[in-house]
Curated annotation (Swiss-Prot):
Cysteine-cysteine disulfides: none
Protein name per UniProt: Putative cytokinin riboside 5'-monophosphate phosphoribohydrolase LOG9
Keywords: Cytokinin biosynthesis, Hydrolase
Keyword Hydrolase assigned: yes
An annotated GO cellular component: cytosol
InterPro entries linked to this entry: LOG_fam
Function: Cytokinin-activating enzyme working in the direct activation pathway. Phosphoribohydrolase that converts inactive cytokinin nucleotides to the biologically active free-base forms.
Keyword Plastid included in the entry's annotation: no
Record's catalysed reaction(s): N(6)-(dimethylallyl)adenosine 5'-phosphate + H2O = N(6)-dimethylallyladenine + D-ribose 5-phosphate; 9-ribosyl-trans-zeatin 5'-phosphate + H2O = trans-zeatin + D-ribose 5-phosphate
Length: 143
């Protein structure tokens, strides 16, 4: 996936990937933490929620931060609170997300972060292995 960014500037390494799943898996493997900036695309929200979900599942133990400039993420945080109040999100899972209105405050909070929620599944491996006798895709296909 290659999308031109408005600024035209590149920071760090640019890596071309085939799809969103590969993009998220690559970010999860290589990132020390995750920060959601103000996004103009659904991809920002989708990636954010997947990183929160992976933390809850125990796939990673990295900080997930929201740079909440001018209250941009207030409605999302209120949605999470409602999920807890209604019993759809466990109280401990609220600790997965760290939020602050400035980059400096967010970095300070993220540096202090330690996972305190209970995982709902055991740690998963990033490596994919064939199951039993099932052939991999395109294997043993009639020519």
């Amino acid at each position: 996936m290659h999308i031109e960014h408005i600024s035209g500037e590149t920071v760090g390494e640019v890596r071309i990937v085939s799809d969103m799943h590969e993009r998220k898996a690559t970010m999860a493997q290589e990132a020390g933490a995750f920060i959601a900036l103000l996004g103009e695309r659904y991809e920002t929200m989708e990636e954010l929620l997947e990183m929160i979900t992976w933390a809850q599942l125990g796939i990673h133990k990295k900080t997930v931060g929201l740079l909440n400039v001018d209250g941009y993420y207030n409605n999302l945080l209120a949605f999470f609170d409602t999920g807890v109040e209604e019993g759809f999100i466990k109280q401990g899972a609220c600790n997965i997300v760290v939020s602050a209105p400035s980059a400096r405050e967010l970095m300070e909070k993220m540096e202090l972060y330690t996972p305190s929620h209970k995982y709902i599944a055991s740690h998963q491996s990033w490596k994919v292995e064939p199951l039993g006798d099932y052939p991999l895709l395109n294997e043993n296909k009639p020519q």
